Amino acid sequence: MKVVFISNYFNHHQAPFSEAMNKLTNGNYWFVAVEEMSEERKNMGWEHDDLPDYVIKSYKSKESLDYAKRKIDEADTVIFGLSGWKNFKLIQKRLRQKKLTFRYSERIYKEGFKWHRFPIQALKHWLVGGRCSCLYMLCASAYTAQDYAKTGCYLNRTYEWGYFPKTKRYDIDEMMGKKLSARSAGWKHPCASILWAGRLIGLKHPDVSIRLAAALKEKGYSFKMSIIGNGEMEQQLHDMICDKNLDDCIEMLGAMSPDEVRKHMEGADIYLFTSDFNEGWGAVLNESMNSGCAVVASHAIGAVPFLIKDTVNGLVYQNGDECHLEMQVRRLLDDKNYRNQIGREAYKTIINMWNADNAANRFLTLAKSLQKGNGADLFDDGPCSKAQIIKNNWFTC
């Protein structure tokens, strides 16, 4: 089967899936990048020094663009991860010929549904593929199906998807033994580690972690909190730490490469994910679960309803409810065995289900089934299972 993946640029989040697809298709896989990576992303360590041969930089020249278009037209199936009319024209010919095509998208109403803009938006999404019965939706957010259903598009044609960063396989017992709580077990005051990582910007709410630390310290908990990242809120966070006298329990480590962040995840007991509904997916959830962290995450994050089963492989708190967040973190700090169990189940979720190899296998199975006109309910859960409509208020504490 010939497969083409079209996206803005090639990065470390897409590499594992692309490698798996290239292997499974015996080299009949191409990744079409339509633009140069932004300087901000390059500075975050997202750039690949040596791009695989299957990556086509269609923006480099007319010859490259023509080559990409030929591959797109000839492919058995295409994954289209872009928006806008200009980009949509890349798959227009396929859709006219009723060739199997998938679009993948995060949610489109991150900032809420606005009735006054609805008629124009609905028409736009209907014109840009929503009307085409051969175009299916890979939902890179648990809220994608809900958002597109409001426009009347992709009804009963939505599948669970996401981002699939590198999956690491560990000796789980050895890794759990490296967590700070395990290493400090013999200390006079055993200590648990809490990690927060991401850009220090409003939608990610890093300030919530500092108020949490203040509440935990006041109640006498022994912990060390690390905050990784930089951004517009950095000085504000430093000031909060100073004002609340939290220098002894919080460290701000600045920006790091993805590999360095993973090392910190491997040593962390608890991972905090505090973003709001503007967080389309949140690949740090995959990575922290893969690292055996007991994750406490906002219900608003796109990846959370797909990846986390509350109280089984992670804890969910109601977005914006800092008291509920504190309660969930205290549950983990109060019971090391429960915390360890949550971390182990999180690791299993990524190793057994939410990884690039499984996603690639399932995608090809789904594509072949759809090409034959067979039923598309092939999987009960996980990548390529039917994506149900999940509303913003699905979780209440």
PLM feature segments, named:
Residues 294-298:
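Short hydrophobic beta-strand element within catalytic cores of glycosyltransferases
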Residues 54-55, 238-256:
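Nucleotide-activated donor-binding/catalytic signature segment of Leloir-type glycosyltransferases, i.e.
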Residues 300-311, 315-316:
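Short acidic/histidine- and often glycine-rich active-site loop of Leloir-type glycosyltransferases
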Residues 176-177, 183-204, 210-213:
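Conserved donor-binding/catalytic core segment of Leloir-type glycosyltransferases
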Residues 255-256, 263-268:
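Short alpha-helical donor nucleotide-sugar binding micro-motif in glycosyltransferases
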Residues 266-280, 293:
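Acidic donor-binding loop of glycosyltransferase active sites
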Residues 324, 331, 338-352, 359, ...:
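A short, well-ordered alpha-helix in the C-terminal region of glycosyltransferases
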Residues 132-189:
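Donor nucleotide-sugar binding/catalytic pocket of nucleotide-sugar-dependent glycosyltransferases
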